[in-house]
UniProtKB/Swiss-Prot annotation:
This is UPF0342 protein SE_1526. Belongs to the UPF0342 family. NCBIfam families: PRK13676.1-5 (NF010212). Pfam families: Com_YlbF. It comes from Staphylococcus epidermidis (strain ATCC 12228 / FDA PCI 1200).
């Protein structure tokens, strides 16, 4: 009997959607979207992050004033309870992804371990 890995991947997707970690992110993000100030801060910070990533990928230097702006945004975000809750939930989900990834790559790790 052939194993269809995609079926298992789809089951994993559903399990992730049913997880407490996913639900916490979904609920926290809803709070961010409902609060105008939180949403604005969140959107600005995401835009700044994407701009940084794009510049890094293109090998461009990030100007000092952009770094300062990002630092100010990060400080404002830390003070926002809604965004802090979202970031904490994202960290927990990230930990789940790391653990799942370790499980997924275990067969390959075992091959190369010898």
């Amino acid at each position: 009997m052939a194993v269809n890995l995609y079926d298992y991947a789809n089951q994993l997707e559903q399990a992730l959607r049913d997880s407490d970690e996913y639900k916490a992110i979904k609920d926290a993000f809803a709070k961010v979207k409902e609060n105008e100030e939180s949403k604005k801060l969140f959107d600005e910070f995401r835009e700044t992050q994407m701009n940084f990533q794009q510049k890094q990928m293109q090998g461009e230097e990030i100007p000092e004033e952009d770094l300062q702006k990002a630092q100010e945004q990060a400080q404002a975000i830390e003070k926002d309870e809604n965004i802090s809750e979202l970031m904490n939930a994202e960290q927990k989900m990230s930990q789940v992804f790391q653990e799942i990834n370790q499980i997924i790559v275990k067969p390959l790790d075992e091959i190369y371990a010898d």
